[in-house]
C-alpha cells in the first residue's frame, strides 16, 4: 500500500498548505488514534496513551491542539510534553510505556514549515505499513467516540527533567566535563531549556546561544545548519569546543577551539575509533550514499566494514538493525549509537564524542589525523513539484559528463529530497575546483530542464 502524505521523516510542509493545516492534522490525530486503539484492543484492551512533544515554532500551538482533539475523538489519552527534542519524545515514549509518541517539528526547516512524525511504543519510527494504515483511516468518516470514551489530556510536568537525566546517564560515570568551556547552540529550538543543563550538570562551563525562541527564529542563522554562529562564538569566548544542534535536536555539528567544523562523517569515524579502543573490535558501521569517500577508506583501513544506506536516518537505522551493528551516521549530523538510544540524538551524540576525547586524551583533529575528506560540492536545486528530472536527456548528459571526467577519483550523486521539492546535486572529487565545476554544470542543467 502506497503512502500519500508520509515522507522519509513523517509528514512535513508549509503551514497553512495541505497537509499542514489544522483540519488535516485533527483528522491525522483521529486516524492515528484509531490505528493505536485497534492495536490496544487486540492486545490488552487498555486505553492507549500518546505523548506529544513539539519544537518552538509558533504554529506548534495550533497543531498541538488539533492533534489533541483528534486523538481525544478517537478515544486516546494524551500527555503533553511541551517543547521537547525529537529524541526526548522517543525516549519518554519508551520509558513511560506509552502507546506512541508524536513530534510536531520540521527539524532544520524555517519557521514557516512544520511537520508531524510518530514513534512506536519502543521509541522507533513507525514502519511503512503502519503509516499506510494511518493514511487509509484518513479517508474514513470521523466518528467521535461517545462522551464516556473520549480521550483525556494532561501535562507531563517533569518531561524535561526526565530527559536530562537520561542524557546524563549515557556519559561514563568515571568522567565529568569539569575544566571544559563549551558553547552550546540550541538553534532557538526544542533543546533550548534542556541541552545547556545537561552539559552544565556534568561540570562544563556552558556558554549557551540560540536559546531565545520567539516562535519565528528557529534555525534562523543559528544551529547545526548555520554553524558560522557557533564558530564565531567559540572563537570569541576562547572555548574548547562548540556543539550546534538543529531545531529538534536530533543532529549536531561540532567545532573545535580553532574554529574547525566537524561533520557527521568525521564524528562517525571518531566514535568507531573510540569503540575499537574500548571494545577491541567494531564489525561494521553504516553511512549513506552521501558519506565522504575518505571516511569509507579510513574505516576499511581499520578493518571495519562500511555499508552505505539510502539518505535518511531511518534507512541508516534499518541497515544497522539488519546487521546487528551499533554505529551509523549521516554527514548532516544524524548519529546513531543503538546501545545508547533507539534514534539519533544530538545531545547524546555530543556526549559520546566528549567521552571519546576524554578517554583518548586527544583532540578531534588528532583523532582524525590521516583522514582528509574529499572536497564535496552540494547544490540544492528547487524544482516545481512533480517535475520529471529523471526523464531529462540534458540532465542525463550533464551527469554522464561529470562521471566520465571523475572516473576512479570522484563520485556524482543526484537525489530528490524526501521532504521538499528539491533536487540535491552532490559531486565529490579530489580537487575542490573539479567538484564545484561539475556540480554547477549539473545544477544548471536541472534548472533549465525543470523551470
Curated annotation (Swiss-Prot):
One of its GO terms (molecular function) is magnesium ion binding. The modification Phosphoserine is found at residue 107. InterPro entries: A-D-PHexomutase_a/b/a-I, A-D-PHexomutase_a/b/a-I/II/III, A-D-PHexomutase_a/b/a-II, A-D-PHexomutase_a/b/a-III, A-D-PHexomutase_C, A-D-PHexomutase_C_sf, A-D-PHexomutase_CS, Alpha-D-phosphohexomutase_SF. The keyword Isomerase applies. It catalyses: alpha-D-glucosamine 1-phosphate = D-glucosamine 6-phosphate. Transmembrane segments: none annotated. Keywords: Isomerase, Magnesium, Metal-binding, Phosphoprotein. It is an enzyme of class 5 (isomerase). The active site is at 107 (phosphoserine intermediate). Binds 1 Mg(2+) ion per subunit. Its EC number is 5.4.2.10. Activated by phosphorylation. It holds the Pfam family PGM_PMM_II. One of its GO terms (biological process) is UDP-N-acetylglucosamine biosynthetic process. It comes from the Bacteria. Mg(2+) binds at residues 107, 246, 248, 250. Its cofactor is Mg(2+). GO terms for cellular component: cytosol. Catalyzes the conversion of glucosamine-6-phosphate to glucosamine-1-phosphate. Belongs to the phosphohexose mutase family. PANTHER family: PHOSPHOGLUCOMUTASE (ALPHA-D-GLUCOSE-1,6-BISPHOSPHATE-DEPENDENT), PHOSPHOHEXOSE MUTASE. This is Phosphoglucosamine mutase.
Amino acid at each position: 500500500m502506497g503512502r500519500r502524505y508520509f515522507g522519509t521523516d513523517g509528514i512535513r510542509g508549509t503551514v497553512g498548505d495541505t497537509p499542514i493545516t489544522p483540519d488535516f492534522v485533527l483528522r491525522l490525530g483521529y486516524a492515528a488514534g484509531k490505528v493505536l486503539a485497534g492495536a490496544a484492543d487486540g492486545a490488552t484492551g487498555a486505553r492507549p496513551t500518546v505523548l506529544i512533544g513539539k519544537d518552538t515554532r509558533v504554529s506548534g500551538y495550533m497543531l498541538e491542539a488539533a492533534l489533541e482533539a483528534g486523538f481525544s475523538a478517537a478515544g486516546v489519552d494524551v500527555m503533553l510534553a511541551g517543547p521537547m527534542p525529537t529524541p526526548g519524545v522517543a525516549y519518554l515514549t519508551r520509558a513511560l510505556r506509552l502507546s506512541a509518541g508524536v513530534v510536531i517539528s520540521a527539524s532544520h526547516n524555517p519557521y514557516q514549515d512544520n511537520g508531524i512524525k510518530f514513534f512506536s511504543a519502543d521509541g522507533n519510527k513507525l514502519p511503512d505499513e503502519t503509516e499506510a494504515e494511518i493514511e487509509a483511516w484518513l479517508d474514513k468518516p470521523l466518528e467521535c467516540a461517545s462522551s464516556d470514551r473520549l480521550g483525556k489530556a494532561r501535562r507531563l510536568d517533569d518531561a524535561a527533567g526526565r530527559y536530562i537525566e537520561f542524557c546524563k546517564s549515557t556519559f561514563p560515570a568515571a568522567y565529568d566535563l569539569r575544566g571544559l568551556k563549551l558553547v552550546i547552540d540550541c538553534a532557538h529550538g526544542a533543546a533550548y531549556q534542556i541541552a545547556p543543563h545537561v552539559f552544565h550538570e556534568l561540570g562544563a562551563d556552558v556558554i549557551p546561544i540560540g536559546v531565545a525562541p520567539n516562535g519565528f527564529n528557529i534555525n534562523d542563522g543559528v544551529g547545526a545548519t548555520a554553524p558560522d554562529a557557533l564558530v564565531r562564538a567559540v572563537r570569541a569566548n576562547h572555548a574548547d569546543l562548540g556543539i550546534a544542534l538543529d531545531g529538534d535536536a536530533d543532529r549536531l555539528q561540532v567545532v573545535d577551539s580553532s574554529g574547525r567544523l566537524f561533520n557527521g562523517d568525521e564524528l562517525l569515524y571518531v566514535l568507531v575509533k573510540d569503540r575499537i579502543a574500548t571494545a577491541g573490535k567494531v564489525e561494521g558501521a553504516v553511512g549513506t550514499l552521501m558519506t565522504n569517500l575518505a571516511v569509507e577508506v579510513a574505516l576499511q583501513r581499520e578493518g571495519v566494514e562500511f555499508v552505505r544506506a539510502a539518505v535518511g536516518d531511518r534507512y541508516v537505522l534499518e541497515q544497522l538493525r539488519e546487521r546487528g551493528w551499533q554505529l551509523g551516521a549521516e554527514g548532516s549530523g544524524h548519529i546513531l549509537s543503538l546501545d545508547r538510544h533507539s534514534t539519533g540524538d544530538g545531545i547524546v551524540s555530543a556526549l559520546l564524542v566528549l567521552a571519546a576525547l576524554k578517554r583518548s586524551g586527544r583532540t578531534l583533529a588528532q583523532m582524525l589525523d590521516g583522514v582528509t575528506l574529499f572536497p564535496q560540492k552540494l547544490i540544492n536545486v528547487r524544482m516545481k513539484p512533480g517535475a520529471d528530472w529523471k526523464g531529462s536527456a540534458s540532465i542525463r548528459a550533464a551527469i554522464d559528463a561529470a562521471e566520465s571526467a571523475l572516473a576512479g577519483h570522484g563520485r556524482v550523486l543526484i537525489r530528490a529530497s524526501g521532504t521538499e521539492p528539491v533536487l540535491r546535486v552532490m559531486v565529490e572529487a579530489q580537487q575542490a575546483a573539479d567538484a564545484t565545476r561539475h556540480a554547477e554544470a549539473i545544477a544548471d542543467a536541472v534548472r533549465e530542464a525543470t523551470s
